[in-house]
Amino acid sequence: MPIAITPEHQDLANSVRSLVARVAPSEVLHEAMETQVTNPPPYWQAAAEQGLQGVHLAESVGGQGFGILELAVVLAEFGYGAVPGPFVPSAVASALISAHDTDAKVLAELASGSAIAAYALDSGLTATRHGPREEALVIRGEVRAVPAAAQASVLVLPVAIDSGEEWVVLRADQLEIEPIASLDPLRPIAHVRANAVEVGDDAVLTNLSMTTAHALMFTLLSAEAVGVARWATDTASAYAKIREQFGRPIGQFQAIKHKCAEMMADTERATAAVWDAARAIDEASPDVEFAAAVAATLAPAAAQRCVQDCIQVHGGIGFTWEHDTNVYYRRALLLAACFGRASEHPQRVVDTATSTGMRAVDIDLDPESEKLRAEIRAEVAALKAMDRGPRKVAIAEGGWVLPYLPRPWGRAAGPVEQIIIAQEFTTGRVKRPQIAIAAWIVPSIVAFGTEEQKQRFLPPTFRGDIFWCQLFSEPGAGSDLAGLTTKATRVDGGWRITGQKIWTTAAQYSQWGALLARTDPNAPKHNGITYFLLDMKSAGIQVKPLRELTGHEMFNTVYIDDVFVPDEYVLGEVNRGWEVSRNTLTAERVTIGSSDSNFLATLPEFVEFVRDGQFDQVAQHRAGHLIAEGHAAKLLNLRSTLLTLAGGPKDRAMPSAAISKLLSMRTGQGYAEFAVSSFGTDAAIGDTDQLPGKWGEYLLASRATTIYGGTSEVQLNIIAERLLGLPRDP
């Protein structure tokens, strides 16, 4: 999924993508690798006619009047096309000037495309004041390896003066510019020298703080980087579909499939971070430094890793000068250099998260929703005024437990109403029944159950009076549910079921279970399966708890020996249970992917641990990565929710939901691994009332999180096959 998620941003992205495909196809890129870059590049006027140079600049200077998020959408498409020339450096430089003064005179030239700008992250420039009133600055020094410096007529450079570091705008004809060989020939670089250049105070961008400047630079460069990463992911996946080895497409091999899926996960995570950082800048948010640091931690690394993996997927041909991977790898490496030292960004993530705090992951709803909010708030207040018993019944009967369900079981709540309900119950401190695994089973009963089944099971489940378990996995059929062997034989009035289930959560506490059994052994693998509602008190059921790594007993083996289940407890059609179970599994994955797990330390808890500890630079670097990754996983869920709110196709929200589940569980494991590794010999303490023992418990428990609800490996297959379109296993 690209940065753009609203219809307007998608239209902008499509327009830019069309331009880039027309003006910078592969043959143009390779020709530019061998020749001197023309200035301005051939596409410059076409881009100006679309208003791209000024998309983020004020209308008063001829710009489009949009924001940094819109510019990020544009730059991501330029990254996807590895467009040669100074467009990206010029856009960043103009954003820096505009942050100082939206009506600065030079911006009109930059918006129209009649001028080109460049900038530097840091420099060796110093300035001293001269004149009777010290009104003049004399600048001396050198700035090394400045992208597009030789193509620019205006340069934005940091200068050390008495009051600290400031940004100045200099004309190219005031400077000595020495072009040098660039690692990326499509983006030339040059050393820049100032030999006693005298400027007035009007050249100083006094309203541009270092925090804002860095946020703009890192966010916009990150936008280009995620475009590069997306190209690498798409290109590797496309090649894996057509390249054959050993008689089948290489994309069918799990090693390649997982590599491509990891590339997509890397790209989506970084994209979410860039999107949020751009929003933070446009909002003038106080946590913009944190958001930009998260983007800078994730995006350039994603671009570099994804292109490296793209080369690997292509094999030898990917290591040739003529292949496009050569162009994109060089762009990824140059971009990484433009971010400065890589360790600085995760350190900034740690510093901001542990001091001013992380950026909130919230949804801002339209003002039109306030009337609905007032109505729901009043209903929640009425519920709060009730005694506990009547309140529980009223919440169940009012459809508040799973409000997205159709009436009378839910409230037929759309996405906006669901969000408001969750917010108001939290704000009003009114607890809804926690129905646990039933939240995965109830949607199937609503969709496929008879009226008698709905009346029998749904009201008490919503009240919390029935506790459910899910009897799907078997010793020989874990993630491969279609391989189950539990057998159901038809008898007078129902079925006799024999088999064994394993990893059944909370079976020892459950009154009822959702059971899959094979009713037609001669049918194809996914057919001949029936979905049963099983009374866990039935004769012939034996539940044996499994003691886990933690010593706790949450999972169970369930032995089913000739258990009778009446026909009235068949859910859906006989032999069509796979269809019913897929509805349950979909509900399960959405739930797991969009909520914190009780097995893991939360991100705020990890940040608190880092804030209270003493760590060396290497550990700080790792902690910053973990915080950035955890925050971005939450952003993936936010983007998925916003896509749902926008009413677009459901499959557009799938990448964020599926990838968030994969990444959140890994990150949770990472929190615990980091903490335990920091305790030294105290990590051996097993007393969970002490901090080392508590985190040791988290570490032990976290190993389950990449297994339950679909193993990480199965999740990677799902991402590769359903989202990238790689061929399924034969």
Enumerate the language-model features and the residues they cover.
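Alpha-helix capping/hinge segments and adjacent helical runs
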Residues: 51, 297-385, 407, 411, ...
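A short, Trp-centered hydrophobic/proline-enriched beta-strand micro-motif
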Residues: 113-124, 464-472, 516
